[in-house]
């Protein structure tokens, strides 16, 4: 479960209640550290990101994170429902495991996230044979709004999330 809380400040948190650990750790991607994406090249300039991840081969596989602008994002189980597309021409193709850093590296608000998602394709490229595709849906929030993003068989869907909560 992930939830947001707004008082005079904005808070976002989530539970990661597995019975075992994947080697989770706090991961920090510094501002402007070169970030390579499988189909979208390397971003040389981007926002700083901090979150929980399994780091494999030096790459942070973020479960949840927040960027320096206050946009937070968490991936939660969506088993049996999630489906990712094949790579397509004329759109930005982002692998499922890259989704959190792709969004948080360049969006300063949920409004910017919506714009970025309008020309993005979430694809079925796994990180490696040892790390198959995770079946997830996501909550993305800032101090003004929350959305839920789900990739299913008929494409990417974006829903307003006025309560700022997402469950498995």
Task: Please provide the spans of the model-predicted regions.
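Surface-exposed patches in mature extracellular/periplasmic domains of secreted proteins
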Residues: 114, 125-133
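Alpha/propeptide regions of enzymes that mature by internal proteolysis
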Residues: 90-123
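Short, low-complexity, polar/charged sequence segments that are solvent-exposed and flexible
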Residues: 30-34, 92-94, 157-160, 167
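Preference for long, solvent-exposed alpha-helical segments and helix-linker "stalks"
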Residues: 119, 125, 165-168
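An acidic- and aromatic-residue-enriched active-site/binding cleft used to recognize and process polar
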Residues: 15-17, 77-78, 118, 143, ...
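Conserved catalytic-core segments centered on acid/base and nucleophilic motifs
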Residues: 2-4, 73, 102-106, 116-117, ...
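Extended amphipathic alpha-helical segments with heptad-repeat/coiled-coil character used for oligomerization
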Residues: 131-168
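A contiguous strand-loop segment
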Residues: 1-91, 124
């Amino acid at each position: 479960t992930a939830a947001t809380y707004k008082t005079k400040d904005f808070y976002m948190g989530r539970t990661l209640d597995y019975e075992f650990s994947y080697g989770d750790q706090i991961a920090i991607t510094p501002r402007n550290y070169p970030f390579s994406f499988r189909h979208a090249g390397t971003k040389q300039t981007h926002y700083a990101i901090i979150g929980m991840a399994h780091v494999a081969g030096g790459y942070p596989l973020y479960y949840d994170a927040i960027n320096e602008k206050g946009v937070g994002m968490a991936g939660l189980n969506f088993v049996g429902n999630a489906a990712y597309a094949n790579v397509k021409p004329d759109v930005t193709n982002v692998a499922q495991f890259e989704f959190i850093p792709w969004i948080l590296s360049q969006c300063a608000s949920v409004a910017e996230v919506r714009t970025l998602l309008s020309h993005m394709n979430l694809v079925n490229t796994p990180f490696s044979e040892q790390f198959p595709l995770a079946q997830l849906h996501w909550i993305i929030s800032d101090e003004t709004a929350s959305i839920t993003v789900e990739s299913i068989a008929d494409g990417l869907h974006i829903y307003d999330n006025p309560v700022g909560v997402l469950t498995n």
